[in-house]
Amino acid sequence: MVKVTFNSALAQKEAKKDEPKSSEEALIAPPDAVAVDCKDPDDVVPVGQRRAWCWCMCFGLAFMLAGVILGGAYLYKYFALQPDDVYYCGLKYIKDDVILSEPSADAPAARYQTIEENIKIFEEDAVEFISVPVPEFADSDPANIVHDFNKKLTAYLDLNLDKCYVIPLNTSIVMPPRNLLELLINIKAGTYLPQSYLIHEHMVITDRIENVDHLGFFIYRLCHDKETYKLQRRETIRGIQKREASNCFTIRHFENKFAVETLICS
């Protein structure tokens, strides 16, 4: 009988030679295998959520841009917009009700009174802004006045009452901005002697205006947060004007070659 034996060392050596092949086979994935990325489910953002976040980002940027544009326009209107010319001047007028065809140099000086105003002209916007300070002797109220030729409106802010009054622009009394500017230049240069007469106009308060937004930027700026009322004009005459004693106040001003006394009654 023949006994067959195997060398254990040789068997272990051959087993070690076969190990790299098996490891290489383990690294080669079959063609139909699917790769799986093992991540934490909490770290994965759904596609719908990412799209919603992108839309919110876009809308937020759009609103910010719109706010910057509107805010810039608002600041420009309030701070950067300057009048083309600013004048502080006065006009002498005859107080009594004597009708003169032309102002006379022989008229007694005591009959003349003076209106002083601060006038700002926004020629490009066709707007005149008149500030009447507290008169020294006359029994009239200080006021701020806006004549808006684009809106065809006039607004009076009585500074004593802190109330606004709006009426259609009377172009027969109020000079256009360019003409008024020429008049003021002539007065300043001394080529025109501002001695004139007084026109009376009578207005009656009617309805209250709840919203002044539609009255234009300049009147809105004047009358915002003020009680604002409509005015109705009565017949404007030169000379004596019958007045009602109760609930009336006057504003004396000029935006022409003559002075105007505006009587406003409730």
Swiss-Prot record:
InterPro entries: BRICHOS_dom, ITM2
Gene Ontology MF terms in the entry: amyloid-beta binding; ATP binding
Cytoplasmic topological intervals: 1-54
Span of domain BRICHOS: 137-231
Transmembrane segments: 55-75
Necessary for interaction with APP and inhibitor effects on APP processing: annotated span: 102-134
Pfam families hit by this protein: BRICHOS
Record key words, sorted: Cell membrane, Disulfide bond, Endosome, Glycoprotein, Golgi apparatus, Membrane, Secreted, Signal-anchor, Transmembrane, Transmembrane helix
Summary of the function given for this chain in its UniProt record: Plays a regulatory role in the processing of the amyloid-beta A4 precursor protein (APP) and acts as an inhibitor of the amyloid-beta peptide aggregation and fibrils deposition. Plays a role in the induction of neurite outgrowth. Functions as a protease inhibitor by blocking access of secretases to APP cleavage sites. Mature BRI2 (mBRI2) functions as a modulator of the amyloid-beta A4 precursor protein (APP) processing leading to a strong reduction in the secretion of secretase-processed amyloid-beta protein 40 and amyloid-beta protein 42.
Subunit note: Homodimer; disulfide-linked. Interacts with SPPL2A and SPPL2B. Interacts with APP. Mature BRI2 (mBRI2) interacts with the APP amyloid-beta A4 protein; the interaction occurs at the cell surface and in the endocytic compartments and enable alpha- and beta-secretase-induced APP cleavage inhibition. Mature BRI2 (mBRI2) interacts with the APP C99; the interaction occurs in the endocytic compartments and enable gamma-secretase-induced C99 cleavage inhibition. May form heterodimers with Bri23 peptide and APP amyloid-beta protein 40.
Protein name: Integral membrane protein 2B
Protein source organism: Rattus norvegicus
